[in-house]
Swiss-Prot record:
Alphabetic keyword roster: Allosteric enzyme, ATP-binding, Cytoplasm, Glycolysis, Kinase, Magnesium, Metal-binding, Nucleotide-binding, Transferase
Family of the protein in this entry: Belongs to the phosphofructokinase type A (PFKA) family. ATP-dependent PFK group I subfamily. Prokaryotic clade 'B1' sub-subfamily.
Protein name: ATP-dependent 6-phosphofructokinase
Gene name of the encoded protein: pfkA
Residues engaged in binding ADP: 22-26, 55-60, 155, 186-188, 212, 214-216
The protein's annotated pathway: Carbohydrate degradation; glycolysis; D-glyceraldehyde 3-phosphate and glycerone phosphate from D-glucose: step 3/4
Species whose genome carries this gene: Escherichia fergusonii (strain ATCC 35469 / DSM 13698 / CCUG 18766 / IAM 14443 / JCM 21226 / LMG 7866 / NBRC 102419 / NCTC 12128 / CDC 0568-73)
Pfam families per record: PFK (PF00365)
Length: 320
């Protein structure tokens, strides 16, 4: 029977992580459970840095960006001996189960702990929206709001100078944030990792737009696809239009979470406690068709496919 749980945030921070922690803590306390917060993700778990959390520990947290527990990259957690120390620390503290909030790397750590016999529940916390088994991740919609605001501002200056702007958006190897921002921001062109890309094809599309009378344009592109400064120089050289690159960077991860992320994080946090009390371990939580769902975390990581939002891309292209 579960009496005490641990909660940690891991990997890149995302707006809404604090709301998720709050959801876990308040739901657990309402069921008579104790909660230990673990500082700095798996690193803090390995180093046994924990704190008892009560309802006041998470007061005024639902609107705060980042994660008050902290987060850290800890690749050494791949080592089974390191994980064995982590499990020993959990058992020493009387912790019966662990809730992990983070991205795919965080899920991998939770999966490994599950394989070693320690029950974990994973909550998807990343702005990249690249987690299997869920339509949306905690932080995605806040990051989208941030990106669209930046695009709106760039459009003002691009329009004034009849300039082409290339905007690099986070997402790693997932184009969801770029696609959504392109539609919401009215971008003329979008480049995502799921679709083959060539500079020449992009330039031809831009030239076609200029021929139709476009005076300025915004190109949204997912990070890691190319050097955006070099791409901007190439576009300027081929089109004769002044072109500038903007890398939004880590500003996309910050800020107060939008209401949808607060609601999603709160629901997922409370749902994690429901699952643990129902005897589930080794699960990851998602939202599909606005319904909370859970999947076997090993199956989700190793076997599930994450569908590409091709309909979003088609929509963006129709609106160029």
């Amino acid at each position: 029977m579960i009496k005490k749980i641990g909660v940690l945030t891991s990997g890149g921070d995302a707006p809404g992580m604090n709301a998720a922690i709050r959801g876990v803590v308040r739901a657990a306390l309402s069921e008579g459970l104790e909660v230990m917060g673990i500082y700095d993700g798996y690193l803090g778990l390995y180093e046994d840095r924990m704190v008892q959390l009560d309802r006041y520990s998470v007061s005024d947290m639902i609107n705060r960006g980042g994660t008050f527990l902290g987060s850290a990259r800890f690749p050494e957690f791949r080592d089974e001996n390191i994980r064995a120390v982590a499990i020993e620390n959990l058992k020493k503290r009387g912790i019966d189960a662990l809730v992990v909030i983070g991205g795919d790397g965080s899920y991998m750590g939770a999966m490994r702990l599950t394989e070693m016999g320690f029950p974990c529940i994973g909550l998807p916390g990343t702005i990249d929206n690249d987690i299997k088994g869920t339509d949306y991740t905690i932080g995605f919609f806040t990051a989208l709001s941030t990106v669209v605001e930046a695009i709106d501002r760039l459009r003002d200056t691009s329009s004034s100078h009849q300039r082409i702007s290339v905007v690099e958006v986070m997402g790693r190897y997932c184009g969801d944030l770029t696609l959504a921002a392109a539609i919401a921001g009215g971008c003329e062109f979008v480049v995502v990792p799921e679709v083959e890309f060539s500079r020449e094809d992009l330039v031809n599309e831009i030239k076609a737009g200029i021929a139709k009378g476009k005076k300025h344009a915004i190109v949204a592109i997912t990070e890691h696809m190319c050097d955006v400064d070099e791409l901007a120089h190439f576009i300027e050289k081929e089109t004769g239009r002044e072109t500038r690159a903007t890398v939004l960077g880590h500003i996309q991860r910050g800020g107060s979470p939008v209401p949808y992320d607060r609601i999603l994080a709160s629901r997922m946090g409370a749902y994690a406690i429901e699952l643990l009390l129902a005897g589930y371990g080794g699960r990851c939580v998602g939202i599909q068709n606005e319904q909370l769902v859970h999947h076997d975390i090993i199956d989700a990581i190793e076997n599930m496919k994450r569908p590409f939002k091709g309909d979003w891309l088609e929509c963006a292209k129709k609106l160029y």
